A protein has these predicted regions:
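Short, cysteine/histidine-rich loop/knuckle motifs that typically chelate Zn2+
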Residues: 48, 56, 68-71, 115-118
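Ferredoxin-type iron-sulfur electron-transfer modules in oxidoreductases and energy-metabolism complexes
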Residues: 25-40, 52, 62-67, 71-106, ...
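Glycine-centered loop/turn positions within well-structured domains
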Residues: 76, 88, 114, 254, ...
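Conserved phosphate/pyrophosphate-binding and hydrolysis machinery centered on Walker-type P-loop NTPases
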Residues: 59, 124, 231
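Residues forming the flavin
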Residues: 1-37, 41, 131-291
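A ubiquitous short alpha-helical element
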Residues: 9-12, 58-64, 98, 205-206
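A broad detector of the eukaryotic-type serine/threonine protein kinase catalytic domain
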Residues: 74, 95, 99, 113, ...
């Protein structure tokens, strides 16, 4: 358990937003982070409940709603480790259930916080921000790459089709097990919707690229601009690899048959986000022109 009286001593404190007059001038992430000392205080608010509803994802309505973490993250454990300053073990516990916490620590809607018992009598623990702190600190310390290196290679070759969150997660875990992994992506950059479907101010693309670079550094192969069925056939994949994992994502939009759908300027969201992000990444600056 963290501080037994932490939930009484400390108020909830979220990661602060950058000043408005600063953040309207660029496409950088909206939020900054707390100091290490402040982060430990936030972790101290976790009571390590006898039945921690935060860490167990419970689905309702046929899977349409969820309470608690769908990943079953070991939240009370790594909150206590943050409070104690044992950031290495906190990282190990976090990545036991979540291979890409730098993504979820930024864009997850955090149903864990809604399920936090502390929320019944005040504000829930800042689980979302605590998760981000653990993984960002781990990257700074150089722990992430080491955690993904296998002890030995199995000689088993696996192709992963698609480099979105599912494909990257699969590639990371398979590489840890010692298999030789190659990730195929039809786009010019890796990351899928992490790269092109989420605005930069929510998930800086440097964060996504950092993960890709880390994976490449520990032996995972990446092949861009390659569409299965056009540039390489499924039969060729099956000949070259022992197994093939399809993680193609959900890039095909669902249209709406409603009045006004064909009006000028009405576009699919992912198409719009992809174009704007590509323009941003291909430009020389992330700053906006003066108003």
């Amino acid at each position: 358990m963290a501080d037994p009286f932490g939930f009484l001593k400390y108020e909830r404190k979220d990661n602060p937003y950058r000043p408005v007059n600063e953040r309207i001038k660029d496409f950088e992430e909206l939020q900054t982070t707390l100091s290490v000392e402040e982060r430990q205080k936030q972790a101290a608010r976790c009571m390590n409940c006898g039945i921690p509803f935060c860490h167990e994802g419970t689905f309702y309505g046929g899977g349409r709603a969820v309470s608690g973490c769908p990943n079953d993250n070991l939240i009370p454990e790594w909150n206590a480790l943050i409070y104690k300053g044992d950031f290495r073990r906190a990282f190990e516990r976090l990545t036991r259930t979540n291979p890409l916490p730098e993504m979820t620590g930024r864009v997850c809607p955090a149903p864990c916080e809604k399920a936090c018992t502390e929320g019944l009598n005040g504000s829930g623990v800042t689980i979302h921000d605590n998760e981000r702190f653990i993984i960002d600190n781990a990257f700074e310390e150089g722990w992430v790459a080491d955690s993904g290196r296998p002890i030995e290679r199995t000689g088993f070759k696996v192709a992963v089709v698609g480099s979105g969150p599912a494909g990257l997660s699969a590639a990371w875990r398979l590489n840890q097990l010692g298999h030789s992994v190659t990730v195929f992506e039809r786009s010019d950059r890796f990351g899928g919707l992490l790269m092109y479907g989420i605005p930069n101010m929510k998930l800086d693309k440097k964060i996504v690229q950092r993960r890709i670079d880390t994976m490449a550094s520990i032996g995972i192969n990446f092949v861009a601009n390659t569409e299965i069925g056009r540039d390489i056939t499924a039969e060729e994949l099956l000949e070259k690899f022992d197994r093939v994992i399809l993680a193609t994502g959900a890039s095909v939009p669902r249209d709406l048959d409603i009045p006004g759908r064909d009006l000028k300027g009405i576009r699919f969201a992912v198409d719009f986000l992809t174009e704007t992000t590509k323009n941003l990444l291909d430009s020389d600056t992330h700053e906006l022109p003066p108003l």
